[in-house]
Amino acid sequence: MSITATSKKIDKALLTDGATVVRGLFDGPTLAKLLALYDYCFANPTPIALSSVKGEDRSYTDMLNSHPKVRELTEQALENLPIGEMLAEVWDSEHVWYLTEEIFLRESKGNKNRGVFHQDTSLAPWDGEHWANFWISFDPVPDDNGLEFLKGTHLGPQYDYVPYDPEDPSNQSKRGKPFWGDKNDPPWQAAPDFEGILVKDPTAWDILSWGVEPGDVVVFHPHVVHGGAPTGPRYPRRRTLSLRFFGDKSYFKPIPPGGVGQTEEMHEERIRLEKERATEEPLEMQAGDLWRGPQYLQIR
């Protein structure tokens, strides 16, 4: 196996806390394959890629790349890795599937590109216990710049996504309106002002965060509230690949079409491309259905 050790395990803190870290999971050859996947996605963006440049600060995000080459590179990167066994063990799941990728680029010298505290499940139709994001950085991340998790919030309610101004996060007047609002029936409750509350009371939540080196992986449930991970003077660039997996206890939760920064035209173009490139017709899922489909790569 192209991995530094075959005895690596995912700590059960993934289940109780919502996030954990696995040190030295990937060796050099595996990282090279994962970086090839990242680089290809970066060079071949989807219609929903989001890019922002402000002076020397740059932010880029893209996901759900349906190009056939992405599938090929993904299968090459995951081949012979024990990720399926690791997740099956911690979840007690008979099966494990690979869902999709997401890529990030953050460049800043001023610590001004913190990610808003949010749940991925506020923007994606995922429900259930058996979901995991593998957050893989190709650049060293110091402790002060790690992704931050509010411990145990994956066991709590579903919040609506509420954007804020990352340059002035404690200013309530600069918070946006709930993203979905009445488009959800019934509407989800608006997310608390996590940043503002933590500024006033740093003990309001236990915060989990880890500095990482290339080869380390932060593993978390997409329902856990997370954010942060700014770049700055000592750490001006971060290239991150997030790989998503699911197991037996994974379900469909309907949400309105679209997403942060997406126009209706962008969303429709993504759906068109996915249908055009699909090798098999995806299954139609209803609320509460098991999350399944022939397009997902089974790794256990």
Spans of model-derived segments:
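Non-heme Fe(II)/2-oxoglutarate
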Residues: 44-48, 55, 214-219, 223-300
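Short, solvent-exposed loop/turn segments at secondary-structure junctions
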Residues: 26-28, 104-105, 122, 140-141, ...
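Double-stranded beta-helix
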Residues: 143-225
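A short beta-loop-beta micro-motif enriched in histidine and acidic residues
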Residues: 118-131, 205, 212, 236-237
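Non-heme Fe(II)-dependent double-stranded beta-helix
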Residues: 2-17, 23-117, 122-125, 273-274
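Short, structured patches in soluble enzyme cores that scaffold and shape functional sites
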Residues: 119, 136-140, 149-151
